[in-house]
């Protein structure tokens, strides 16, 4: 019984480690900036292929960032960002881990 439980925990842990959770973003979540960033950066623990990044500025509808040229699985992304508006931004991302697991998340920042 103990062996079976230990095996199940080992299988679960190896699957959990195969995913690539988000470690860092620039701007950081809830950051307050003095100027609009020129790029959005993501840092993942393992490799991931971003499939969609949507930016929503305050009450406006979201728009997708251009991910052409980002066809590989990477740990770090720096995606060009063009805006000249102050206010609050919501960044929503979606990606695929090397193990086939779909991941997503979001973070916010504002520009004064």
What residue ranges belong to the model's regions?
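Acidic, low-complexity Ser/Thr/Gly/Pro-rich repeat segments typical of extracellular/periplasmic
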Residues: 22, 33-35, 41-111
